[in-house]
Amino acid sequence: MFFNKKNNQDELKKAAAIEAAKHIKSEIVLGVGTGSTVAFLIEELVNYKDKIKSVVSSSEDSTKKLKALGFDVVDLNYAGEIDLYIDGADECNNHKELIKGGGAALTREKICVAAAKKFICIIDESKKVNTLGEFPLPVEVIPMARSYVAREIVKLGGQPVYREKTITDNGNIILDVYNLKIDNPLKLETELNQITGVITNGIFALKPADTVIMAKKDGSIESF
């Protein structure tokens, strides 16, 4: 697929979102993620309204946008299994392992991925990396455990920074971890989740994307 618009980053995000929407089938329970790329997806979903049975949203922000467009947004507990979940990423490697959570919705995003039959990740090519970790890794933490968790993360080689004035939709805080070269995403995802006080972290390796749709500066769309 090629598009003729000026290939700035927003247009690349929009192109990836439009391509992902083509995977929507009739009577679908659709999971919708969070972030700037997903914002373009939500706009595109208007063209698929007759195919979408209901929508499960990973954040309050996306829920507001979806409801404003007239979509039936339901709680995951009532939706059951999600047929297709579409979301963006902050980083993506060749194995479709991701860093997500720059928008602080990582826990709900991870729940949606776990409950979905298929997960499509939409990115522009600036998000593609060989090794995860250049983007700071978000970790959602119970507030009273912040200092303890930070000390444990330092032992793993990271430099945690408290994301001030950010409270997640679940009422928790975010530590952004810098200077972690994530050579083994599966191992680190597990190790971080085992720290008492951690809700989850932004590595998506135990359950990576099934398909990545990437918009490139040359105007093409690559799927892998």
From Swiss-Prot:
Q: What keywords does the record list, in alphabetical order?
A: Isomerase
Reaction(s) the record says it catalyses: aldehydo-D-ribose 5-phosphate = D-ribulose 5-phosphate
Cystines in this chain? none
Q: What class of enzyme is it?
A: isomerase
Q: Where does substrate bind?
A: 34-37, 87-90, 100-103, 127
What Enzyme Commission number does this protein have?
A: 5.3.1.6
| CDD domains in UniProt | RPI_A
Q: Which GO terms describe its biological process?
A: D-ribose metabolic process; pentose-phosphate shunt, non-oxidative branch
Assembly: Homodimer.
> What is the official name of this protein in its record?
Ribose-5-phosphate isomerase A
- Species: Francisella philomiragia subsp. philomiragia (strain ATCC 25017 / CCUG 19701 / FSC 153 / O#319-036)
